[in-house]
Amino acid sequence: MYRLLIINPGSTSTKIGIYDDEKEIFEKTLRHSAEEIEKYNTIFDQFQFRKNVILDALKEANIEVSSLNAVVGRGGLLKPIVSGTYAVNQKMLEDLKVGVQGQHASNLGGIIANEIAKEINVPAYIVDPVVVDELDEVSRISGMADIPRKSIFHALNQKAVARRYAKEVGKKYEDLNLIVVHMGGGTSVGTHKDGRVIEVNNTLDGEGPFSPERSGGVPIGDLVRLCFSNKYTYEEVMKKINGKGGVVSYLNTIDFKAVVDKALEGDKKCALIYEAFTFQVAKEIGKCSTVLKGNVDAIILTGGIAYNEHVCNAIEDRVKFIAPVVRYGGEDELLALAEGGLRVLRGEEKAKEYK
């Protein structure tokens, strides 16, 4: 049996879990107030504070740090890498510290994992960060030579549910053609072939379907004109794409369940936005099916919004002619991180090296 500590830092909380193999024996969300977070100038400056909070929580739960076989952290905004479990090394720590692709709380996952693991002489890993990039070269072409397409998506959950589905049907993930749709604060639609995500929309930067707080792809000419209208700053326009775009820009709420409920009660504006969301997701699935030349084993709906039966039914109604539709509501990031660590500890795969 292997015991793992899992660390998943978010902007205002740190989720931790203790796993004995795949069994969760302890889980806690450590919430951090805005006042606490505001004391620190950079994400990295929060490192010692968050580490201490984690160690205090373990002590309170009578869990000995010395009982751990490995520590797994959420991967941050590193350089683009292929999917897998990575041993935390010096190069990774440097890139997480400076934030080579941006500052995000998830950058602390590998840093804290390494620090705790080092003290008890066990390995530290990260698994499938959002920067997983396995795009086919043809997918990188955007149509504008100085803007290549990038892969930024919900890699951890997409990979975890794809593997889960493969296990359930008794096949290898690498042998299946899948379209995986993650619907949460952002929406990512990934094309999985031969164990790689060869095509996916950039969830963070305005590609693909809109979501509760992100715009997805919008008419480019109009966006350019908006940028030069002298009405908005750079930061305000970026916020329209990520943070104040999508559902919230139309209805002033990010609660998509409430939007669906109102739509079903007859609210016409909510009904239109709800239909537009399912329409855009279905359209993106259709695009991905052409990447696989129609040879699709399954379409998987996942993420928080996939708990909503009405949303899933509406999408399935449009895409079931392509392939069977499977639903895995929510996202179990702690388990997905634990599974990644276990695959290496059991020798099922080798830990990758970050360069």
From Swiss-Prot:
It comes from Clostridium acetobutylicum (strain ATCC 824 / DSM 792 / JCM 1419 / IAM 19013 / LMG 5710 / NBRC 13948 / NRRL B-527 / VKM B-1787 / 2291 / W). Its main location: cytoplasm. Keywords: ATP-binding, Cytoplasm, Kinase, Nucleotide-binding, Transferase. It is found in: Cytoplasm. InterPro entries: Aliphatic_acid_kin_short-chain, Aliphatic_acid_kinase_CS, ATPase_NBD, Butyrate_kin. Pathway: Lipid metabolism; butanoate metabolism. The keyword Cytoplasm applies. It holds the Pfam family Acetate_kinase. One of its GO terms (cellular component) is cytoplasm. This is Butyrate kinase 1.
